[in-house]
């Protein structure tokens, strides 16, 4: 019976609680072993911590792959489409497939760049130009497909656009543009060069995969999208703090594309941009204070302030999306008040990340390793 359940469209719902408690137990076991190792064999603790990190990363990578497959099976199934009055044919053709192509192109480009960085550095520049062109074309194709989907299924649906609610397209595009300007403008304060090497790309891949897996370990779900997770943004914020804001914003943008593939409720191209690539690019702002001398000996404070700034920028993106795209969810309430209150869950997520980040930076071994990586990327 369990096997049949796993093979059904409801496999995600069967697997999710099992994975949640398995992951909590796995992490708790690693923490317990680390505590024992630290108090009994301090001379080998650094090596243990490094090995534990890669074991956890491998576990979360497998978990992410399983969750991703099951999530697609659930949200793009005939059953889910029928229950939610979705047109499965257009949903797959105009939302899922273009998003999968974009993610494939982006990830392939990053892998190619990483390999060239290590084995053929002279070929990086022409490859980068071509890869950026292909990725831009794939992103434009996604936006065009979402525009077609909006016109066919959302524009006159009687729900998102009705007598009491409308999707404000111009405001959405302006909100997305202003959010990009805000995030890009803040990256100016990061004086480190925007140059990836094989190591920074490897860490980007590992930490993004860890964030993706942890995003499925939900402490609670919001009714119309969004959730408080088991510190899923911690790996991304740590990456930004160690490797710099510019790299963090770029990795967050790419991570946002991966997150968007899971969501069958992409109703407008600008809403997609605000909630996913731009919203998660904002997470990279966590690194704004990492290279500031005032926080050199107090990384806990620098990381905490950076996390609050990043969470606030992400919050703004979600609020704008809620106000201008999802007015229907407010059901007659003041849409600004509704969106501000609804999206406040972001700060609960950030608070958990800050607690975990402070605990990590209170470890001399972790701080030493992080500082070594930070100096190497100045």
Regions found by a protein language model. Give the residues of each.
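Short, strongly hydrophobic alpha-helical membrane anchors
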Residues: 1-18, 78-88, 152-164
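Hydrophobic core of alpha-helical transmembrane segments in multi-pass integral membrane proteins
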Residues: 25-34, 60-65, 103-111, 136-146, ...
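Short helix-perturbing small/polar motifs within transmembrane alpha-helices
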Residues: 30-33, 110-114, 177-190, 204-208, ...
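Membrane-helix interface motif
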Residues: 65-81, 144-157, 320-329
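Individual transmembrane alpha-helices with interfacial aromatic-anchor signatures
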Residues: 91-96, 165-169, 335-352
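Interfacial aromatic-anchored transmembrane helix boundaries in multi-pass membrane proteins
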Residues: 149, 153-164, 214-230, 253-289, ...
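Hydrophobic transmembrane alpha-helices
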Residues: 166-239
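Generic transmembrane alpha-helix motif of multi-pass integral membrane proteins
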Residues: 231-248, 285
């Amino acid at each position: 019976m369990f096997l049949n359940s796993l093979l059904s469209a409801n496999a995600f719902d069967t697997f999710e609680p099992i994975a949640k408690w398995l992951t909590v137990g796995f992490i708790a076991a690693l923490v317990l072993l680390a505590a024992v190792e630290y108090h009994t064999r301090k001379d080998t603790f650094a090596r243990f911590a490094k090995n534990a990190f890669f074991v956890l990363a491998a576990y979360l990578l497998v978990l992410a792959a399983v969750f991703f497959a099951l999530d697609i099976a659930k949200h793009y199934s005939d059953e889910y489409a029928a229950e939610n009055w979705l047109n499965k044919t257009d949903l797959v053709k105009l939302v899922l497939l273009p998003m999968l192509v974009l993610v494939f192109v982006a990830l392939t480009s990053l892998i190619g760049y990483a390999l060239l960085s290590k084995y053929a550095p002279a070929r990086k520049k022409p490859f980068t130009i071509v890869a950026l062109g292909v990725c831009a074309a794939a992103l434009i194709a996604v936006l065009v497909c979402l525009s077609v989907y909006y016109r066919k299924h959302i524009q006159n649906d009687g729900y998102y656009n009705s007598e009491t609610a409308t999707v404000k397209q111009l405001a959405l595009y302006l909100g997305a543009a202003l959010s990009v300007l805000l995030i890009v403008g803040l990256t100016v304060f990061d004086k480190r060069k925007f140059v990836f090497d094989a190591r920074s790309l490897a860490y980007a891949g590992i930490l993004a995969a860890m964030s993706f897996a942890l995003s499925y370990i939900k402490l609670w779900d919001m009714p119309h999208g969004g959730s408080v997770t088991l510190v899923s943004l911690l790996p991304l914020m740590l990456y930004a703090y160690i490797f710099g804001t510019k790299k963090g914003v770029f990795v967050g943008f790419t991570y946002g594309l991966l997150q968007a593939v899971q969501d069958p409720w992409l109703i407008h191209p600008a809403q997609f941009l605000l909630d996913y690539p731009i919203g998660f690019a904002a997470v990279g702002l966590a690194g704004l204070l990492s290279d500031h001398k005032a926080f050199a000996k107090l990384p806990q404070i620098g990381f905490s302030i950076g996390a609050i700034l990043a969470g606030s920028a992400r919050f703004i993106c979600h609020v704008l999306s809620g106000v201008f795209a999802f007015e229907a969810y407010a059901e007659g309430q003041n849409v600004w008040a509704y969106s501000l209150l609804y999206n406040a869950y972001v700060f609960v997520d950030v608070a958990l990340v800050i607690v975990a980040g402070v605990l990590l930076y209170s470890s001399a071994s972790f701080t030493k390793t992080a500082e070594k990586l930070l100096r190497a990327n100045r």
